A protein has these predicted regions:
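Amphipathic, Lys/Arg-enriched alpha-helical "gate/interface" segment within cytosolic domains
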Residues: 1-129
Length: 129
């Protein structure tokens, strides 16, 4: 992994969420490799709501790598998998718009993009209380 670039993923069993934290200058290929590695270590990851926190990162995910994770995800989730919620947290209004451009590649996800963790968590909690 490039120096200063870090991708972590943790499962929160009490909320049934996977929380991804991305820090540093994004290396698109490495980022997607790490997502796949984390997902592969979780039983039925498609049953979890997910948070992707990009607030402490810089750079863009290349389209070829978005295509790669979308294809990997589609190939690993069952056809009858329920929809899950995905909150993407970014650090500026431009990325807010950019992040939404990939929503159609993940048809089983109810995806929303946010500028704050609090707003993302409030949205994830809706309907789960």
């Amino acid at each position: 992994m490039p120096q200063g670039f870090q991708v972590t993923g943790r499962v929160e069993p009490e909320t049934h969420r996977i929380i991804f934290s991305i820090r540093g200058q994004i290396d698109s290929r490495v980022l997607i490799d790490r997502f796949i590695e984390i997902y592969a270590g979780i039983d039925a990851p498609w049953t979890y709501d997910r948070v992707f926190d990009y607030r402490r990162s810089d750079g863009l995910v290349e389209h070829v790598d978005v295509d790669r994770i979308a294809a990997w995800w589609a190939g690993h989730i069952p056809a009858d998998a329920p929809r899950s919620k995905v909150a993407v947290i970014v650090n500026n209004p431009l990325d807010l718009v950019r992040a939404r451009s990939v929503n159609d590649q993940f048809p089983k996800d109810d995806r929303q993009t946010f500028l704050s963790l609090d707003d993302a968590l409030s949205w994830l909690d809706e309907g789960h209380k």
